[in-house]
Structure formats: C-alpha cells, structure tokens
C-alpha cells in the first residue's frame, strides 16, 4: 500500500473512479480545479501495486475541515484503505489545528454513515433534498482536539 498526495497526472483516474462510484460525480474540470487552483483543498490517494484505488478529498479553511469525498474502488473495499486515508487526513487536520471537521452524507449510504460514526462523527441535522436528485443528507460533525 502506498499513500500520497494526488497530482494533476492522477486526474483522469480520479475522475474514472468517481464516475464509477457516485450518483452525482465531480467532473474532470472540478477535479482539476481541486488539484491545481483550490488552495484549501487536499486530495490523498491510496495505491495498491501501483494502481490508484481510492482517495479522500478535504478542505482546511482556517480552523475548520470539511471532508468532501471518500472513495475506494469497489473490489478494494473493506480492506482498511478508507480507514488509512481517513487517519492520514486527520493527522493533517490536527496538525493544522482545526477545531471541527464536517461532512455531508446521503441518508441512504448506510456503510458511509456507520464508518463516520465509528470515527467519532455525530449526526447534527438532516438536510432535506440536499442532493440534486432530491435525496436528503445528514450533516455530521466531529470535534478535533
């Protein structure tokens, strides 16, 4: 297993993985923006035998972190890759002295919700029709100390 910061050379693979995983995926342009222009954005990738198999994207804006995406290629799920990416991201989030970390997750994504609860997040509120397809989201928060 190898973990590293994403580079612009990863953008096509990130986009392919995104489109295979999410109902409303980020576009190639959005990934390019996150990697090249958004000064608050960080993307860590997980590689297995040289193959990019997952990533986490998060923002650190002053004393708040936001987890935007956690994605692992389907055949590599439940092997600890997401947890390792999460742990590495939180090392950076703590180092940057963030007070809280937030995220939104589809109410139907039970695996992700359980993962976030296991990692200390709490459901704060349900956001009605948060996603473009009308699905609700949970807004979840974790204190970072």
Q: What do the PLM-derived regions correspond to, one by one?
A:
Residues 5-75, 86-88, 92, 96, ...:
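Acetyl-CoA-dependent GNAT
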Residues 18, 27, 102, 128-129:
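Basic, alpha-helical helix-turn-helix
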Residues 41, 100-106, 136-143:
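Conserved catalytic core of the tyrosine transesterase superfamily
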Residues 104, 117, 122-138:
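Conserved catalytic-core motifs of GNAT/GCN5-like acyltransferases
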Residues 1-3:
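Extreme N-terminal starter segment of soluble prokaryotic enzymes
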